[in-house]
Amino acid sequence: TKYVWPKYSQVIVRDYVSGAMENTTATIHGEFLQQHSRDLLDENYEDVISHELFHQWFGDLVTTESWSNIPLNESFATYGEYLWREYKYGRDDADHAGLNDLNTYLDEAGYKQVDLIRFNYDTREDMFDSHSYAKGGRVLHMLRKYLGDEAFFAGLKKYLEDNKFSSVEMHNLRLAFEAVTGEDLNWFFNQWFF
């Protein structure tokens, strides 16, 4: 799905309280993101940039109907990091980053076991964890491998087109993939998302 907004800006803010925020058409970043060419030798923040850019589709064009479904936004933005790396640096680099994401999730899973989509939480901040980000991105990759690239990306396009400018829940994503593949995917979504 093409970018629908008239522009896109990235704004660096001093003393910003968060890493980044994906406002529609203008992502706010902390000043850590502003780097000189020599800084890039040590570390770059392409993952943050690609993550926030993917939110223009997954979070802004289509958003969630509740905090319980926030993994729809964050899982896709995290998987966007993988897709960017795969495009720019190749599959090996992307797979290495995916392995890092998996380990990040597994570290958290050592003391916290919850479903990706969960309706019982103390505060909405509880939803912004490695389950929603790292595990969600890995589950999307697993779904891509199961369906194949053609069906996976056709399903994403259908999901975005059918739901643009609206709020959704996880079942909307499942229905888009089912419409494209003709396959009942309840088993996959029930096992990995709920």
Regions found by a protein language model. Give the residues of each.
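Hydrophobic alpha-helical and helix-loop surface patches within well-folded domains
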Residues: 1-194
